A protein has these predicted regions:
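Core structural elements
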Residues: 158-179
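Conserved catalytic cores of very large enzyme subunits
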Residues: 1-165, 186, 190-343
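Well-ordered alpha-helical scaffold segments within catalytic/enzyme domains
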Residues: 178-186
Length: 346
C-alpha cells in the first residue's frame, strides 16, 4: 500500500532537486507536471497549491494540470488521459506509457476558411468535407499500422509498451486565430469569437464521434506547431491568402498582442473555449520575470475558476556564453563574471 508521507516527501524533494539541477545545465527533459484537483474555484489540496506556487516563484519550470475529476493524468505539452471511457484524451507525449497518439493529421483552418469565402460557401460546409476526408485518411493509416503489427514490424507494440487500442488518431488544428482574423473577428474574450471557435471544434468533435468504433478512437488537438505553423504561413502567403504573421498561433489569442492580459489568456484557454478540444492545448504564459508565491497562488485560483486545465509559465532564464553560468532570472549582466554576452531560455 502506498505511503502518502513517503510519496509526499519524494515529490517535494525531486522538484526542489531538479530545479537546482537546471542551474547546472540546460535540461529540457524530463517534463514535469503537477496534477491538482480543483473544486469550487480553487485547488482542493491547499497545501499542494501553496507548494506549487512556491516552486513557480523559485523559478522552477513545469506544467500544471488541473481537473475537477481525479481520473486524469497529464504530461508534456498537450496530453490528458482520463480513465473514464468518454473519448477525451490529451495525446502529445503520453500520460501513461501505453497511451498516446499513433497519427496526427493537421488541418490548416486559415486556408480552409479563406477558401470557403473565395467560393462563397459557409466555412462550416467546406470544413466538413475536409474533416470527413481527414478521418478517412486516418482510418487508412490505421489499417496500414494494423498490417505492420500483424507482421511483427512494431516491436514496442508487441512488447506491450504501447497498446494500439489505446492509441488515438488525432485531428490537429492550426491557424484558428488567423482564420478568425480573416473574417474580421476580434481575437479576445467575446461572444463572436467564442462561437467561431465552438463551431469549428464542435464540427471536428462531431466527426470524431461519428467515426469512432470499438477499435478506433479519435480526438482533436491544438498542436504546438513550432514547425508546421511556419510552413502554413509561408505556403498560404505564396498562394495569395491573408497571412498576418510568419508563424500561425498555437493558442486562442494573438501571442504578440500586448493588450491581452494574463487573466484574459486564462479565460481564452478556459472551459468555454476548450470544451470541444478533446486532444488538448497548453497555455504557455509568457512573462518577463517571475512572480511572487502569492501571485502564482492567485493565478491557480483563476485557472480553477475559468477551467484552464493545462498551463505553464515561461520566464527567460539567463545563460552566460562566457562562463556558462545559468540564472533563473531575466538579467542584462551575468552576476558571476559580469559579461553581457548572454542568451535566454525558458
Amino acid at each position: 500500500r502506498p505511503s502518502w508521507p513517503a510519496l509526499d516527501w519524494l515529490q517535494r524533494r525531486f522538484m526542489r532537486w531538479f530545479n537546482q539541477e537546471r542551474t547546472k545545465a540546460v535540461l529540457t527533459f524530463p517534463v514535469e507536471t503537477m496534477a491538482l484537483l480543483s473544486k469550487d474555484g480553487d485547488v482542493l489540496d491547499k497545501e499542494y497549491a501553496d507548494f506549487t506556487a512556491q516552486m513557480y516563484a523559485e523559478g522552477h519550470s513545469f506544467f500544471t494540470y488541473m481537473s475537477d475529476n481525479a481520473d486524469s493524468l497529464a504530461s508534456c505539452c498537450r496530453l490528458r488521459n482520463e480513465i473514464q471511457d468518454n473519448g477525451f484524451s490529451y495525446t502529445l507525449g503520453a500520460g501513461g506509457v501505453s497511451t498516446g497518439s499513433k497519427s496526427v493529421l493537421t488541418v490548416n483552418l486559415n486556408r480552409c476558411v479563406q477558401q470557403a469565402t473565395r467560393e462563397g460557401r459557409p466555412y462550416t460546409d467546406f470544413l466538413a468535407e475536409i474533416i470527413d476526408l481527414m478521418h478517412k485518411v486516418q482510418l487508412a493509416y490505421n489499417e496500414n499500422l494494423k498490417d505492420m503489427l500483424n507482421k511483427g514490424m512494431l516491436p514496442l507494440f508487441d512488447a506491450g509498451y504501447i497498446n494500439i487500442k489505446r492509441q488515438y488518431l488525432t485531428i490537429g488544428v492550426n491557424g484558428m486565430v488567423e482564420a478568425a482574423e480573416s473574417l474580421g473577428i476580434t481575437i479576445s474574450d467575446n461572444t463572436e469569437y467564442e462561437q467561431f471557435v465552438g463551431n469549428i471544434l464542435g464540427l471536428i468533435e462531431h466527426y470524431n464521434r461519428q467515426y469512432r468504433t470499438k477499435e478506433v478512437m479519435f480526438n482533436c488537438e491544438m498542436i504546438p506547431a513550432e514547425n508546421v505553423g511556419v510552413k502554413h504561413a509561408r505556403w498560404d502567403r505564396e498562394d495569395g491568402y491573408y497571412v498576418p504573421r510568419d508563424c500561425y498561433n498555437s493558442y486562442f489569442y494573438v501571442v504578440e498582442d500586448e493588450q491581452t492580459d494574463i487573466i484574459e489568456k486564462f479565460r481564452l484557454h478556459g472551459r468555454r473555449f476548450i470544451e470541444h478540444l478533446t486532444g488538448g492545448s497548453a497555455l504557455h504564459m509568457n512573462l518577463d520575470e517571475h512572480l511572487s508565491a502569492p501571485q502564482y497562488r492567485q493565478l491557480l485560483r483563476v485557472a480553477a475558476k475559468e477551467g484552464c486545465n493545462y498551463f505553464t509559465f515561461n520566464i527567460p532564464n539567463t545563460l552566460c556564453n562566457d562562463c556558462g553560468h545559468i540564472d533563473k532570472h531575466h538579467l542584462r549582466e551575468c552576476p558571476h563574471c559580469h559579461s553581457t554576452n548572454l542568451d535566454y531560455l525558458t
